[in-house]
Regions:
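Enzymes that bind and transform nitrogen-containing heteroaromatic metabolites
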Residues: 1-148
Length: 148
């Protein structure tokens, strides 16, 4: 049975605006590369998936670690929970209806860890009792506002 893990990066004052947090420090980024390499898959809400689609690109200014993360991310199966998206990118499956049922099935059929990305989706999954573990990553910044 797979374990559903919600990982959340937040500022020291408790906000989760990923665009304002900026990139992680190199040590943390290396951790995330290894984390993604070891996953069974990723489940995203629409907004977080749209942010993470960045890694489907191949940008000339990327360094070796950026490329390593992109390769790891692209290799993992992804499930995207959205009623508004009509399609998703490579190695991704759109989940438009009855996402709780789909996620319960994934947990039952797969082994390892499935990472959840997106605050709105995580709240729904938590209310349904589907998240098995929470991981909080504190970023050494104070944002002063945003999504708590």
């Amino acid at each position: 049975m797979a374990k559903l893990v919600y990982g959340l990066s937040q500022s020291l004052d408790g906000y989760v605006d990923h665009m304002k947090l900026g990139p992680p420090v190199p040590e943390a980024f290396h951790h995330f590369i290894e984390l993604v390499r070891g996953l069974t898959g990723l489940i995203y809400g629409r907004r977080m998936y749209e942010i993470m689609r960045y890694w489907d690109e191949d940008l000339p200014d990327w360094d070796a670690e950026d490329r390593d993360f992109a390769v790891a991310w692209r290799s993992q199966p992804k499930w995207v929970v959205s009623r508004s998206l009509k399609s998703v990118g490579p190695n991704a499956t759109l989940v438009a209806d009855d996402f709780e049922k789909v996620i319960r099935r994934l947990k039952a059929e797969l082994d390892g860890e499935i990472l959840v990305g997106g605050t709105v989706l995580a709240q729904s999954l938590a209310e349904a009792g589907l998240i098995d573990e929470y991981r909080l990553y504190l970023r050494p910044v104070v944002l002063g506002g945003g999504t708590p």
